[in-house]
Amino acid sequence: MTHYHSEYYSEVEKFEYQVTHVTEQILQEQDRLRGSTLHEYNQTILQLVSDYEMFNSNGQCDPSEINLPLEKLESWTNSLKQIHLELESIDNFLRYAIPSDQTILNLSKFNESKYETLQAEVSELRDINVVQLQKEIESLQQQITTKSDENLLISEKIKESCLEASQDIDQCWKLLEQLEAYENANPSTEVITTTDPAFSTYNQWKWNQLAESELKHINQQLITLRATKEKLDKVFSKRSELETSPKSIETFTSYQLLSQLWRSKFIRQLLPDIANLEVYPQSGKLKFEVGIMQVIMQIESGIIKSVSLFSYELSYDRIETIKEDILGRIEHQKSLFKVLVVITDYIVNSL
């Protein structure tokens, strides 16, 4: 089946492959660490059994039957190591501390002062070297423990991130399926293709913002028209009670003639590029078109407050650039006619 948005499918498949690869690496590393810990645990037990006869065991252990958390296994391994060291220390102590007859005879011949000197040297060696080495060992053990905890925490975070990414990818697949179903149900919909899906999405988002702004403008015009309609309805409802003033008729006729004269003589002759000119006196807006560009001007007390540009054939960034250049050119301009000339000429020369 041919997909309308094959580039989106390719991107999602690429991300899915990367997340799957990272997840497999994390799981393999955890299995390797678990197997290494179980092997060390088994070897420690075998060493204890072979060294000490007090353990009545054949020394066989199947790590696969052990179903314990990795942290507890590590704690047990450390405890077994500590017991092993303590037993070795006791063995060495008993071996050298319990004297034989020959040892007692030799000790009786020792010079007490020499013995005290040797004892002082041993104490000094123990206090200086052994204690220092013990501190270094404890420091290294602490560093190893800290790094192990950090690695475990990082591994857990990576697993959580992979899980969240997998859920997001599943959501992407669902959205793509919904999009395909919608486009299959609406074959007349124009398919937008691009080599860069990120740019296409960004550009569509900008156009949505532009369309939303235009919708707000149209809603404002609708509110104004409704208010005008309500006022006209009130006037027409009382039409029988009103007497038409000849002066009012003359003023209205003059306004209509002046408006037609302005459109036909001034605008069409002096500014032929302007089309579909519309004036909204109540809202103070002036709307017209120049080529593919639609221009809306907000005028208050004879001062131009804002200029908005719309076009479905130009990109959002291009429209914003033209708008900024126009605002810079009319910033200190007070004549409405000159402003129209500047806007018209710049748009015509830019397109």
From Swiss-Prot:
Coiled coil: 124-153, 208-234
Main location: nucleus
Any one GO cellular component localisation term in the record: nucleus
Nucleus is among the record's keywords: yes
Biological process according to GO: homologous chromosome orientation in meiotic metaphase I; regulation of meiosis I spindle assembly checkpoint
UniProt subcellular location: Nucleus; Chromosome, Centromere, Kinetochore
Source domain of life: Eukaryota
Keyword Nucleus among record annotations: yes
Keywords linked to the UniProt accession: Centromere, Chromosome, Coiled coil, Kinetochore, Nucleus
Pfam families assigned to the protein according to its UniProt record, in alphabetical order: Kre28
Subunit structure comment from the entry: Component of the KNL1/SPC105 complex composed of SPC105 and KRE28. Part of the ten-subunit outer kinetochore KMN network that includes the KNL1, MIS12 and NDC80 complexes.
Function recorded in the entry: Acts as a component of the outer kinetochore KNL1 complex that facilitates microtubule-kinetochore interactions and the spindle assembly checkpoint. Kinetochores, consisting of a centromere-associated inner segment and a microtubule-contacting outer segment, play a crucial role in chromosome segregation by mediating the physical connection between centromeric DNA and spindle microtubules.
Family: Belongs to the KRE28 family.
Name of the molecule in the record: Outer kinetochore KNL1 complex subunit KRE28
Organism: Kluyveromyces lactis (strain ATCC 8585 / CBS 2359 / DSM 70799 / NBRC 1267 / NRRL Y-1140 / WM37) (Yeast)
Gene name of the encoded protein: KRE28
